């Protein structure tokens, strides 16, 4: 193609640079020139995931829109792998974070793939809440021209297994969409199932769309942010524990630890809002108990990932022993023909309740039977890392990462039980002992890019962790925006986590306001949501002034109660009805002014 020479006097190029540019592009087609133009514009104007806007598909386009709705990173990894598979066969795909997806364009989609996880009691992941609400609202459009597929990730230890995926799948079909494939629901060991599904959906999509030279996707949110690190979930950093300090009082009902991990010269980087993945080993005493309950020796060889290991080593390093599931109970009952457990199999609610209340070791104790080693490991699920909200900013702590860990401890008929990862960190790692870790980036829980923007932080218990990171970062940035903390726990004297630090931030003026809710210090229980209502007028003024709202804590109770309180504040002081308030809060969520890190 021949292009007309531009007037060189009007260009920021010297004649030699212009000549090289013309020589390089002389045989380009108009489409290729347009692509190069967009490429260099993208180089000049890089956008972060938080600010990027998803590209709307052209009407009639057969490009594939791939939505990632992730809570802990697993759905994102599956979506990214599918994107790579599609690009490898020259299919045009646009991968977009559910939080960045312009959902009002959904009726324009021809080919839509959703990869989603589930959180809490069957809710969609945080980044997909707005999309979920829209699809279930009266505003949802007909999707008669849309073909779709859903891959759902979940955990069978929870009652509402893969519920978000079921919701999306059923609603997309109800709105007129055509299923490309039946929905697939995957448990925590999802990798093999995901690989099989990816191969199937790629074949289906190849038959539905022409093969072209793919256009590189416009950055479409957090799924496309590049976090380069040699350390991953599959290849974690071997770091060392440097501090393990109990930060609740001696009379507290809670055992909360401040944990510091030395990253050394690894170069591992994180941002406030990220989580730390921790691989742990099961308690050797628990392993011994399970082996003895089944009349095994512990040296029996079992297959793990294609290798033969002694049973005790396999149980300590490779299998989940502290979380029971309905599936494990059902399979154990069927294998052993247990007179007590078999009647539960036909009652889903009772089965789920029993699994939630009875650890694996106690199930074996209460319903004893003899299993061989292979049958035992066949019952169990693979050990997976635990994620903890990071409680520090590298701007302050540099080569360290801090955690706020609530140690899970309870008794079953006089026998002490504990959480796998929390007790590992609190009880079984020596000073400078090894901890295998990785960063799980969370681009859906980020400080405002403008340091002048006020922030409202709402947390209870260990939900204080990311806000400690936030305030450290705001201090390091010398951010002028106001900071308001709402924090709740049972007792002021026993459970005020990081009390000295927060009081110092108040004294220095960095923490503009702090409201504390102590639920057990008086006859009437007071929670953070009560403090939100109490401060409603001022809270609304902050929101009106552009404040970003952050919530961290329990998904099933605290986060729901906080959201209800926020809606009531918006209704009372914003002059809206409940439906309008709900829409307003959804708009804040879409604008990333309402972000939650809940578990």
Curated annotation (Swiss-Prot):
GO terms of molecular function: flavin adenine dinucleotide binding; FMN binding; sulfite reductase (NADPH) activity
Entries under Pfam families matching the protein: FAD_binding_1 (PF00667), Flavodoxin_1 (PF00258), NAD_binding_1 (PF00175)
Binding site for FAD: 322, 356, 386-389, 404-406, 410, 419-422, 599
Chain ranges of the Flavodoxin-like domain: 64-202
Annotated residues for binding of FMN: 70-75, 117-120, 153-162
The protein's Enzyme Commission number: 1.8.1.2
Enzyme class: oxidoreductase
Subunit-level organization: Alpha(8)-beta(8). The alpha component is a flavoprotein, the beta component is a hemoprotein.
Family per similarity comment: Belongs to the NADPH-dependent sulphite reductase flavoprotein subunit CysJ family.
Protein's name according to its UniProt entry: Sulfite reductase [NADPH] flavoprotein alpha-component
Organism: Salmonella arizonae (strain ATCC BAA-731 / CDC346-86 / RSK2980)
GN (gene name): cysJ
């Amino acid at each position: 193609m021949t292009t007309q020479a531009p007037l060189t006097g009007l260009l920021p190029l010297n004649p030699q640079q212009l000549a090289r540019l013309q020589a390089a592009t002389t045989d380009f087609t108009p489409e290729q020139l347009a692509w190069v133009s967009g490429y260099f514009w993208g180089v000049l104007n890089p956008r972060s995931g938080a600010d990027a806007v998803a590209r709307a598909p052209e009407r009639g386009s057969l490009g594939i829109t791939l939505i990632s709705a992730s809570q802990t990173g697993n759905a994102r990894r599956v979506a990214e792998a599918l994107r790579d598979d599609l690009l490898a066969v020259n299919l045009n795909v646009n991968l977009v974070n559910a939080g960045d997806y312009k959902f009002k364009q959904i009726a324009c989609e021809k080919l839509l793939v959703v990869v989603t996880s589930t959180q809490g009691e069957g809710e969609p992941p945080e980044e997909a809440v707005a999309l979920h609400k829209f699809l279930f609202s009266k505003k949802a459009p007909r999707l008669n021209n849309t073909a779709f597929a859903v891959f759902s990730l979940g955990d069978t230890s929870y009652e509402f297994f893969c519920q978000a995926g079921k919701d999306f799948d059923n609603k997309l079909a109800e709105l007129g969409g055509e299923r490309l494939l039946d929905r697939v629901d995957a448990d925590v060991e999802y990798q093999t199932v995901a690989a099989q599904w990816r191969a199937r959906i790629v074949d289906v999509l190849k038959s539905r769309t022409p093969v072209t030279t793919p256009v590189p996707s416009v950055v479409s949110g957090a799924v496309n942010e590049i976090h380069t690190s040699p350390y991953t979930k599959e290849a974690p950093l071997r770091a060392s524990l440097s501090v393990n300090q109990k930060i609740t009082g001696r009379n507290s009902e809670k055992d909360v630890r401040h944990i510091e991990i030395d990253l050394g010269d690894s170069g591992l980087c994180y941002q406030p809002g990220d989580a730390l993945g921790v691989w742990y080993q099961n308690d050797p005493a628990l392993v011994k108990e399970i082996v003895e309950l089944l009349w095994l020796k512990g040296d029996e060889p079992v297959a793990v990932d294609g290798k033969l290991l002694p049973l005790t080593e396999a149980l300590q390093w490779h299998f989940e022993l502290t979380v029971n599931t309905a599936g494990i109970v059902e399979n154990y009952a069927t294998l052993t023909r247990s007179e007590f457990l078999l009647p539960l199999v036909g009652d889903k609610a009772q089965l789920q309740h029993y699994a939630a209340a009875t650890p694996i070791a106690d199930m074996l104790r209460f319903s004893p039977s003899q299993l061989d080693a292979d049958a035992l490991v066949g019952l169990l699920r693979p050990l997976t890392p635990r994620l903890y909200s990071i409680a520090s900013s590298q701007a302050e702590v540099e080569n360290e990462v801090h955690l706020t860990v609530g140690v899970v401890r309870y008794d079953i008929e006089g026998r002490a039980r504990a959480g796998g990862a929390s007790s590992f960190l609190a009880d079984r790692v020596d000073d400078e002992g090894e901890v295998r870790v990785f960063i799980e980036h969370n681009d859906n829980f980020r400080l405002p890019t403008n340091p002048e923007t006020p922030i409202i932080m709402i947390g209870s218990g260990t939900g204080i962790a990311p806000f400690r990171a936030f305030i450290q970062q705001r201090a390091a940035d010398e951010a002028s925006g106001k900071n308001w903390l709402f924090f709740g726990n049972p007792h002021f004297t026993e459970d005020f986590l990081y009390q000295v630090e927060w009081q110092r931030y108040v004294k220095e003026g960095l923490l503009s306001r702090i409201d504390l809710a102590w639920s057990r210090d008086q006859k009437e229980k007071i929670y953070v949501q009560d403090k939100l209502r109490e401060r409603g007028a001022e809270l609304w003024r902050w929101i009106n002034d552009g404040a970003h709202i952050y919530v961290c804590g329990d998904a099933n109770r605290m986060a729901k109660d906080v959201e209800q309180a926020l809606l009531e504040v918006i209704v009372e002081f914003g002059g809206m009805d409940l439906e309008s308030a709900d829409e307003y809060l959804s708009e804040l969520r879409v604008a990333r002014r309402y972000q939650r890190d809940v578990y």
